[in-house]
Amino acid sequence: MLRVSVRSLVRKASSKAGSKAAVPAAAAAASAPLSPATSAASARAVPPVGESRVSIPPIPGVAAPRSHRAAAAPAKKAAAPKAAKAKTPAKASRKIKKAASKPSAPKQAAGKMRKAAGKAQRKIKAAARKAAPKKMAKSFGKKGAAKKAHK
């Protein structure tokens, strides 16, 4: 009898006030004396107890509040294999851009296309290895000023 009223009370409380309010309301209903006058409406009128925690056996058909659910281990994502990335300099050089944008020959067989794609990739990687940001040709030091004076 009491279990049925608590179940309905928990459902109503969880839908109205959120899952956190369901536990104190159910505790208040469980502590109320068993009498024919006790119903879900009168039990709801009882103010919920502030801090006291009462352990209630799980009721079938009623979802437990999030705080009482067993913490499920987060599902681990399968680690994707890391592809070898070409070491590119800070700024992409013109060589890399040219190698990447070279148009492939029109309408080739599948094997030739694959071969051409591989060639382009190798060219890009080679260009990335070789290309390093160039240093400034002009030096604004004292030597430069002395050279200008000798001219």
From Swiss-Prot:
Residues 1-9 form a propeptide. Keywords: DNA-binding, Kinetoplast, Mitochondrion. Residues 112-151 have a biased composition (Basic residues). Histone H1-like DNA-binding protein involved in the organization and segregation of kinetoplast DNA (kDNA). The mitochondrial DNA of kinetoplastid protozoa consists of about 5,000 minicircles and 20 to 30 maxicircles. These circular DNAs are held together by catenation into a highly organized compact disk structure referred to as a kinetoplast DNA (kDNA) network. Binds preferentially to a specific fragment of minicircle DNA and is able to compact kDNA networks through DNA charge neutralization and condensation. Belongs to the KAP family. Residues 15-49, 70-91, 101-111 have a biased composition (Low complexity). Associates with the kinetoplast DNA network. GO terms for molecular function: DNA binding. One of its GO terms (cellular component) is kinetoplast. It is found in: Mitochondrion matrix, Kinetoplast. The gene is KAP4. Residues 13-151 are annotated as: Disordered. Induction: Present at a constant level throughout the cell cycle. The keyword DNA-binding applies. This is Kinetoplast-associated protein 1.
